[in-house]
Amino acid sequence: MAKNKGVRLVITLECTECRSNSAKRSPGVSRYTTEKNRRNTTERLEIKKFCPHCNKSAIHKEIK
């Protein structure tokens, strides 16, 4: 019998300021991977995390 996937889902968080900001410390876009419980959090995740390219804490939004 096949097992179900479960409620935990691996997602990718991407910096929102890296995409629009041209004056950055280094080129590139900051990405983090994490898990979320799709039963508790149905909408897209937004977390404030440190971005090494912007060199500050910025909002990271879920992309996958």
Swiss-Prot record:
Localization of this protein: Plastid, Organellar chromatophore
Residue stretches spanning the membrane: none
Main location: plastid
GO terms for biological process, alphabetical: translation
GO cellular component: organellar chromatophore; plastid; ribonucleoprotein complex; ribosome
InterPro entries hit by this protein: Ribosomal_bL33 (IPR001705), Ribosomal_bL33_CS (IPR018264), Ribosomal_bL33_sf (IPR038584), Ribosomal_zn-bd (IPR011332)
A molecular-function term among this protein's GO annotations: structural constituent of ribosome
Alphabetical keyword list: Organellar chromatophore, Plastid, Ribonucleoprotein, Ribosomal protein
UniProt entry tagged with the keyword Plastid: yes
Keyword Repeat on entry: no
Protein family membership: Belongs to the bacterial ribosomal protein bL33 family.
PANTHER family, sorted: 50S RIBOSOMAL PROTEIN L33, CHLOROPLASTIC, LARGE RIBOSOMAL SUBUNIT PROTEIN BL33C
Name under which the protein is recorded: Large ribosomal subunit protein bL33c
Organism of this sequence: Paulinella chromatophora
Gene from which this protein is expressed: rpl33
